[in-house]
Amino acid sequence: MRLLLCLIFLVFVFNFALSTVHFKDTFDNDWESRWVVSDWHKEDGKSGKLVHTAGKWFGDENQKGIQTSEDARFYAVSAKFPSFSNKGKDLVLQYTVKNEQKVDCGGSYIKLLPSKLDQSAFDGESEYSIMFGPDVCGASKRVHVILNYKGKNHLIKKEINKVETDQLTHQYTLVISPDNTYKVLVDNKEIQAGNLADDWELLPSKQIKDPKQSKPVDWVDVKEIDDPEDVKPAGHDDIPASIVDPEAVKPEDWNEEDDGEWEAPTIANPEYKGEWKAKKIPNPEYKGEWVHPLIDNPEYAEDNELYLFNDLGAIGFELWQVKSGSIFNNMIVTDSVEEAKDFSEKTFVANQEAEKKMFDDLEAAKAEERKKADEKLAAEKAAEKEAEEADEEEEEVAEEDLVKTDDKKEEVKKSTKKVDHDEL
């Protein structure tokens, strides 16, 4: 048993040692020497600026990525690496993205491109080999997997809706294998897998309808016909759809001079049977649904190398973001799933817990600040109300004192008049 485990370990180490990493980037301080920002939309001022940052919350402040920093802008940046073919090997594309802005409309996908890419002119029309990653806009949330086959871009037929929309870092992984299968993983968990031929319309149909065949003119495909022996009953069409309500009575206060001649209301006729239609019977001439004969499609050619990309030489982001704030990092292009997993453990996994804790602490602090602000506002409003009530009370007291003073003056006046009168 121990020998078997040792052999398995040696095979793993051997395969790991033979793996090739075509591209890897964690965006150190020298990242701009490897990445080229496109001139796309610079003239019209719609090109967004990328900044080098770990963001507002992180697991490791030294693990920085590139962040979109301006809203409603286009972003296009790329890096090149030695051209390679994935013939006979797995192709693994992996990267992380953190949408600090709580994205509501914007792409966060990555592209693998051919080596001929003109980096300064890189834009939405540039040819690419693979486009992969999340895209969010309103209610639409999906992971794109678009493959270029023979010069045409093909979107995966299945909806991959497992898009993380919180404000933490998430990792997206695409694996394409020589047996023409694929896997999509989010945070190292498989969310989609299948066969390239089944899940993309890369190949034309094996069979097509024979263009030389058409349904015979005498083909009967009507299942039922009217019963020729069924006859419409006499007087059927004479029955009206509505009749005068026999229970209706002219109101006692009805005045024909003022109200006009009274007419009884009508009701649906219970005897009315609607438009007469003959009963249906099975059609004795019915031959069934005509099926168009199929022939082999002359355009179809089997391809056992749907997975193959002969010239991969660049990687890049070409995005439109309504709301900026996405941070991209930890990219790897390799032929080894194990290599990608190891890279993930050292970068993404190692910082997940610490990043979430920092985020939660910041959110808790914000909540506490909001609570204090609300309490302060409530206290200020209560103080204002109390002051208003005190002012109103003072005004009432002042009015009462004024009335009392006026009453006293009136009494003095009356008393003076009385004295004067008595003296007279």
From Swiss-Prot:
Residues 386-400 have a biased composition (Acidic residues). Keywords: Calcium, Chaperone, Disulfide bond, Endoplasmic reticulum, Lectin, Metal-binding, Repeat, Signal, Zinc. GO terms for cellular component: endoplasmic reticulum; endoplasmic reticulum lumen; endoplasmic reticulum membrane; phagocytic vesicle. GO terms for molecular function: calcium ion binding; carbohydrate binding; unfolded protein binding. Disulfide bonds join C105-C137. It comes from the Eukaryota. An alpha-D-glucoside binds at Y109, K111, Y128, D135, E318. Residues 1-19 form the signal peptide. Residues 370-424 are annotated as: Disordered. One of its GO terms (biological process) is protein folding. A motif (Prevents secretion from ER) lies at residues 421-424. It is found in: Endoplasmic reticulum lumen. Sequence repeats lie at residues 191-202, 210-221, 227-238, 246-256, 260-270, 274-284, 288-298. PROSITE patterns: CALRETICULIN_2 (PS00804), CALRETICULIN_REPEAT (PS00805), ER_TARGET (PS00014). Residues 260-298 are annotated as: 3 X 11 AA approximate repeats. Residues 370-385, 401-424 have a biased composition (Basic and acidic residues). Residues 191-256 are annotated as: 4 X 12 AA approximate repeats. Belongs to the calreticulin family. Molecular calcium-binding chaperone promoting folding, oligomeric assembly and quality control in the ER via the calreticulin/calnexin cycle. This lectin may interact transiently with almost all of the monoglucosylated glycoproteins that are synthesized in the ER. Can be divided into a N-terminal globular domain, a proline-rich P-domain forming an elongated arm-like structure and a C-terminal acidic domain. The P-domain binds one molecule of calcium with high affinity, whereas the acidic C-domain binds multiple calcium ions with low affinity. The interaction with glycans occurs through a binding site in the globular lectin domain. This is Calreticulin. It comes from Dictyostelium discoideum.
